[in-house]
Every structure is written in C-alpha cells, then in structure tokens.
Amino acid sequence: MDGVRLTEIVEKMNLKNLTPGVDITERKVHVPDVNRPALQLTGFFDHFDLNRVQIIGNVECAYLETLTRERKDEIYEKLLAHKVPCIVFSNDLQPESEFIETAEKNDIPVLGTCKKTSSFMGELIRWLNVKLAPCISIHGVLVDVYGVGVLIMGESGIGKSEAALELIKRGHRLVTDDVVEI
C-alpha cells in the first residue's frame, strides 16, 4: 500500500481537526511509527524522522509552558517548517493560537484526541501496522488443516478446488478459494 489517507486516520481514531483551514484530503501517512517531538521542542533536529505522525502530550506541553513567548514562536517555526504528516495533541490538550496559526501557515494539520498519550500511540501504531502491511494476491486455495494453513497452488484446471473439497469432507475448513491475499 502506498500510504493511509489522513482522513481515514481521523475517522478511525475519532480525531478532531484543529486546523480546518488545512486540506487533509490528499495527505497520507506512509510509516506506522510515531514520534513524540520532545527533543525537537528543545531545538535538536538531528535524526528527526519527519515522515512520522508527531504526538504532543502532557510532558511536551508542560515544557512549552516554561518557555518565553519569543522562544515558543521560534520553536513553533522550526518544528512546523518540517513537512510532517500531522501533529496530534493527546489528553484533550488545546494548542495555543500561535501554534495553530503557524501550523496553518506551514500547511500542517493539527489534530486532537481525548485519549491518553500512551493509549493513543499504541492504538495508532497497531492500526497503521495492519493498514501499511505489504500484501500480495495468489491464485490458489487456502485450507485450515488441523489448525495449520495449507495453501494449494498450481496451474488452472489441475484440481486445486477438488483437493480442498476432499479435505473439507474430512472435517477441515476452507479459508478462501481462488484468490488468497497474503
């Protein structure tokens, strides 16, 4: 798969779009990993993976509260200049209006969730791992034989379905016939 649309993530994870002025319809997430940008909020951007969804929780917000207005604006500019897929505020945290303005200026979607940071991260990572998993289609028959998946493959017309039918008659289970997605 070439990515998961951000609109699908927003719908599946029940996220609020805090930047309605930013178009999220064509934006995609291509990696199942996420990042909490704590180090980036201090100004350290070495090895920053900008392909990941960025999640800001209580710790990051508490750190931002200690900064002066000028330093916050500088950090917002640096963080949001990177073209990350989106930034999610967890724990029902509300970003400052300056953060939203800078995000809209840089065309970065800012989303919100009421879920706890760790719970949201785990749920999102698990879901993205499934959605972004590689998948191939094979012509054949998949049968469950004593709890083990058996894939019967071969040229068209050689009796794959008939072999599966004989296994089914003996109490085994058909999983899929004709096209098997792995």
Residue ranges and their predicted role:
Residues 52-55, 85-88, 108-111, 149-151, ...:
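Structural motif
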Residues 1-79:
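Gly/Thr-rich phosphate-binding loop signature of adenosyl cofactor/nucleotide-binding cores
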Residues 175-182:
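Walker A/P-loop NTP-binding active-site region of P-loop NTPases
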Residues 127-147:
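P-loop NTPase nucleotide-binding/switch module
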Residues 78, 102, 166-167:
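Hydrophobic/aromatic ligand-binding patch that stacks against planar heteroaromatic rings
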Residues 147-175:
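Glycine-rich phosphate-binding P-loop
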Residues 57-59, 91-92, 114, 146-148, ...:
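Fold-independent oxyanion-binding glycine-rich loops
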Residues 83-86, 92-127:
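Charged, amphipathic alpha-helical linker segments immediately N-terminal to NTP-binding catalytic cores
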